[in-house]
């Protein structure tokens, strides 16, 4: 038996998934030459992960989006060592990445309490600097929220992702028979009778050219990175975005989705993935599905029928291929079972990999003569 529930992701109004900030460490304090006194260091700027915080709160509370730490105290007769300037903390949600304006990754905040130094304060005046202080570090940074979910639904507009999410959970994304119905991420939770929960993220539909940010592709592709597994959702009868765009068969759709992920970030194709073939209630769906099955089984031969701009360098390997109808419920019990099975298999593999890595590290630290060799993988 399986039942469903809903998780509400958007607690506030407009969904904000990124924010750009100006941060500056405090200037150090002046030294005192005649007594050899040291000025205090300037304060630092930190980004801190805090529960129940949203990026929208930062924009609302700090419209100028400027965070400047305190200046270090000057050295004086009363205090030869000046006090450090006051630190500034920027509270942000968990599950964000922090990058510089130049695109350099500064770090990630994945758990509550995680802290990241983003602007260091300047050193106070000292004999080494002629008792003159240094200015604090100045930079613009970007905070990007990436959804953290077990599965991310990947598909072109109108593939039925929103309908599938509704069928799998009680999330209620907007559903209509036209492309781009979903314009904001939506998360649903599937709950099983033993209280196991699996989160599924419905991401806005991709279009061809998403990897170069067409249709705000980067805005949506980045969320895929923080899902454990992917779930491709494909219309069994094919897809056409508009009358002036080419019609794509179901197999072409699979290739194009893989291509877009590959061009954005190739390692995304190494994620475990389930292929869901939706709309099996439509006329001639069975014959289309049989054709797709044959093409997937003989991908090496089938891809030569398509142009190179459609074909990814690496073909996506799907752990399961499941025909369903989100409208009638056909195939959904099997899909729910496979969703859980796939996650449990990944957890087992990850646990074993971590165990092997720890053992290898232990062997490097301890002489081989002092520990038994049975059951231990040999270091490479």
Swiss-Prot record:
Record-annotated disulphide pairs: none
Source organism, top-level taxon: Eukaryota
GO MF annotations in UniProt: GTP binding; GTPase activity; magnesium ion binding
Main location: nucleus
This protein's record includes keyword RNA-binding: no
Residues the entry annotates as binding GTP: 155-162, 202-206, 278-281
InterPro entries: G_OBG (IPR031167), GTP-bd (IPR006073), GTP-bd_Obg/CgtA (IPR014100), GTP1_OBG_dom (IPR006169), GTP1_OBG_dom_sf (IPR036726), OBG_GTPase (IPR045086), P-loop_NTPase (IPR027417)
GO cellular component, one term: mitochondrion
Chain ranges of the OBG-type G domain: 149-344
Keywords: GTP-binding, Nucleotide-binding, Nucleus, Ribosome biogenesis
Family: Belongs to the TRAFAC class OBG-HflX-like GTPase superfamily. OBG GTPase family.
Purpose: May be involved in the ribosome maturation process.
The protein, known as: GTP-binding protein 10
